[in-house]
Regions:
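Alpha-helical membrane-targeting segments
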Residues: 1-25
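C-terminal cap of thioredoxin/glutaredoxin-like
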Residues: 3-4, 11-12, 28-32, 43-55, ...
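Short hydrophobic/aromatic-rich motifs at helix boundaries and adjacent loops
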Residues: 21-23, 61-66, 169-171, 231-233, ...
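Alpha-helical context
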Residues: 22, 26-30, 68, 72, ...
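Structural alpha/beta surface segment adjacent to cysteine/selenocysteine redox centers
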Residues: 38, 42-142, 254-341, 421-422, ...
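Residue-level preference for long, well-ordered alpha-helices that form the structural scaffold
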Residues: 81-84, 88, 160, 249, ...
Length: 435
């Protein structure tokens, strides 16, 4: 690692962390825009929130501008179009259950004819403002709830009785849209994952007239979903196990591991297994995003010295040089030193200090590069669009998800497991009474 990076990164990161996370006021002259695709399942979820959002926007922010694209962007993480499509359907199904969105039990992508009919309806309608948003929500329901008969009827009426409308707040184009997102003051907010962040921003700038209540079962950082002692004992007795696939140069890996270890692992009796990955170039990250996540999750995150490929390899060497039962604590300490002390493991002095701190007498003789490649292969088999990748095993079931945005799923899954367990016990008792 260059001397400039080794010395300048900790200074720069400390300065950046001490700055206010939010710019006090963002310009409102461009209003608020949402980008959708009719064949995007996240757009379907987002459409169910838009009438309420429009209702509580101040007059300054109305009307909400809607851009409907018929062009998708390339899937992330080298996923195929089919893999991405299946991931989105599964993920949206989980989100819909967690946040009480309307959703079909067996969702399918709408067919081309239905999509064209839906676009025609929305292009032709003279409705505007909240009325248009309610219509758009209904059209999305017809597409994704397989209500093709209703869609054909509405399409026939729109085609016969109305002409194409041209309103400035309603745009149809071919802007590549991977999944639904809002745009405010040139900043992008993912339509589901960042909805609460957007609402906080709008509320901060007094651009809402009422309290925003969108994701009703959202789990805040460090607020446990399960607090009843009996329920907690039930989960702990199931011995949950969690695998983490992490890129060592990615600060999100530190934030996620630290949060889970400090807040969830002991509380729920989770066995954590760490699988470091080879260098993925994730040291070029969004500093403001990582800073914001650090403050939201209450995990320390400065000063740091971004690891290079050589530093990541050195971190993995230290990790695999400790006994298996000590590896979790070792990885926590390695990442803590890198992301809160500014240590550079590719620098011999720092490497030797880390080695002493971890009480490593003999470095491993394993081929570290080969070991990381094996972890890469197992991680790729999970077919996830982002890192870190998590696999939770409990009650003979396995659940795979990804990123810091989905950490809430751990507790949500526990809650669902308990619900199924109690349901099964009640059914068993009822059967015994009958006999």
């Amino acid at each position: 690692m260059s001397l400039l990076r080794r010395w300048f990164d900790p200074i720069r990161s400390s300065w950046f962390y001490q700055k206010p996370v939010r710019q006090e006021v963002l310009p409102t002259d461009q209003g608020l825009t949402i980008y959708l695709r009719l064949d995007d399942v996240y757009s379907y979820l987002a459409a169910q929130q838009l009438p309420q959002l429009e209702e509580i926007l101040t007059d300054e922010m109305k009307p909400l501008k809607v851009v409907i694209s018929n062009q998708t962007a390339s899937p992330p993480n080298e996923m195929s179009a089919l893999e991405w499509q299946q991931y989105c359907l599964n993920d949206a199904k989980i989100l819909s259950k967690q946040h009480r969105f309307s959703f079909h039990e067996t969702p399918e992508q709408p067919n081309a004819e239905a999509l064209q009919q839906a676009e025609t309806i929305l292009r032709h309608t003279p409705l505007r403002g909240q009325d248009f948003l309610y219509l758009m929500e209904d059209v999305f329901h017809m597409l994704w709830q397989k209500q093709y008969g209703k869609l054909r009827t509405l399409h026939a009426m729109a085609s016969r009785h109305h002409q194409v409308q041209n309103f400035p707040e309603r745009v149809f184009n071919q802007t590549p849209v991977l999944s639904a997102y809002f745009e405010f003051a040139d900043r992008k907010y993912q339509a589901v994952d960042d909805l609460l962040r957007l609402a906080r921003r709008l509320e901060q700038q007094k651009l809402l007239t009422d309290n925003p209540i969108f994701l009703i079962n959202h789990i805040e950082w460090r607020e446990h979903l399960i607090s009843d002692a009996e329920e907690l004992n039930e989960i702990q007795a199931l011995d949950p196990e969690l695998d983490l696939y992490i890129a060592l140069e990615d600060p999100i890996s530190w934030l996620l591991l630290a949060y889970i270890k400090e807040e969830l692992a002991d509380y729920y009796n989770i066995q954590l297994n760490i699988y470091p990955l080879s260098y993925h170039g994730r040291d070029q990250f969004d500093w403001s995003l990582a800073t914001r996540l650090s403050k939201r999750s209450e995990v320390k995150f400065t000063p740091f010295c971004r690891p290079t490929a050589a530093a990541s390899l050195a971190m993995a060497e230290l990790f695999y040089s400790v006994p298996a039962e000590q590896q979790l604590e070792a990885m926590y300490e390695i990442l803590r030193q890198v992301w809160t002390k500014g240590k550079d493991p590719s620098f011999k002095t720092h490497f030797d200090q880390l080695r002493r701190d971890l009480n490593i007498e003999q470095l491993t003789e394993q081929d570290i590069s080969l070991r990381l490649q094996q972890n890469d292969m197992y991680c790729e088999m999970k077919s996830q669009p982002s890192l870190p990748v998590l696999e939770l095993r409990i009650a003979e079931q396995s659940y795979v998800f990804n990123s810091l945005y989905r950490v809430w799923m751990i507790e949500s899954i526990f809650s669902n497991v308990l619900e199924e367990l109690y349901k099964s016990e009640n059914e068993s008792e009822n059967e015994q009474r009958k006999t």
